[in-house]
């Protein structure tokens, strides 16, 4: 049995399906935080400052005053507000229909929800770009980021800086608002639903599918999925990701730890291609 058929068999015969989606899945769908050519085109000022990808902005310390908010406005508008559900996520949803599944994603692009996945079946483990909260935490209120972005865009300068007067501020106390990411009620609820799913499926057969997960947020999906596989007698684990020889990691992206190798399969291929092949197989057998 080849890898695709083995994966399809596990997907269709297991009592439960746990899906992990990393940056590689959204990259296969068309959203890449590592695209240096696009970054240079869209953010020449940051490129000149030595920042060459969206990934590098996460740890960048050399922001000019007001520049990070200007960058975030344009970046979030492009990734969250202007990008619809991408076809690959529609395909993944169609593939999982009929399964008792739960999906965990480290991506903040909201693609699962845009594609119509039931919110109760999705945990956005890193949160999303969609809300702002008070930096002083004067309350637990959450604010939709879209109106603030729309109000800021006309005031972004060529170097991406934005004057303080055009930054978002808390309507209660006046402190700056900041992206919420994980500090939301939705995140807390998703975390609880994830743990409930793991408890419910503890003694059952489960297919664990990991798409496009590397090492940037290994503690969110990669390491927990390996642990869950090792703990469960009836687990079957599939790691689907392309390798990156230029990576500084000592472990290859598709590598499987030896202790769980007997119930795991590494598929060193593009996540999108694998999902499309699985969906074609499902349709052929319908």
Segments the model singles out, each with a brief description of its role:
Residues 1-286:
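Conserved catalytic alpha/beta core of Sir2/sirtuin-type deacylases, generalized to analogous enzyme cores
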């Amino acid at each position: 049995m080849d890898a695709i058929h083995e994966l399809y068999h596990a997907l269709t015969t297991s009592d439960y399906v746990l899906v992990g989606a990393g940056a590689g899945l959204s990259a296969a769908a068309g959203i890449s935080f590592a695209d240096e050519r696009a970054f240079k085109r869209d953010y020449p000022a940051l490129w000149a400052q030595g920042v060459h990808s969206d990934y590098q902005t996460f740890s960048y310390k050399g922001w000019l005053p007001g520049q990070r908010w200007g960058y975030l406005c344009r970046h979030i508008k492009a990734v969250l507000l202007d990008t619809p559900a991408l076809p690959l996520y529609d395909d993944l949803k169609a593939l999982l229909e009929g399964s008792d599944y739960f999906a965990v994603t480290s991506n903040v692009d909201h693609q699962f929800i845009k594609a119509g996945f039931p919110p109760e079946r999705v945990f956005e483990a890193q949160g999303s770009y969609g809300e702002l909260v008070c930096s002083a935490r004067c309350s637990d209120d959450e604010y939709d980021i879209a109106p603030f972005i729309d109000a800021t865009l006309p005031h972004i300068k060529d170097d991406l800086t934005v004057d303080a007067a055009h930054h978002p501020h808390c309507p209660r106390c006046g402190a700056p608002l900041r992206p919420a990411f994980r500090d939301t009620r939705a995140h807390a609820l998703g975390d609880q639903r994830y743990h409930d799913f793991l408890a419910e499926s503890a003694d059952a057969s489960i297919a664990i599918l990991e798409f496009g997960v590397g090492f940037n947020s290994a503690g969110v999906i990669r390491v927990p999925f390996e642990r869950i596989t090792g703990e469960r007698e009836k687990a079957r684990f599939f790691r689907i990701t392309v390798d990156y020889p230029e990576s500084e990691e000592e472990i290859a992206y598709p590598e499987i730890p030896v202790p769980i190798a007997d119930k795991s399969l590494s598929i060193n291929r593009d996540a999108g291609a694998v999902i499309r092949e699985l969906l074609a197989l499902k349709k052929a057998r319908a």
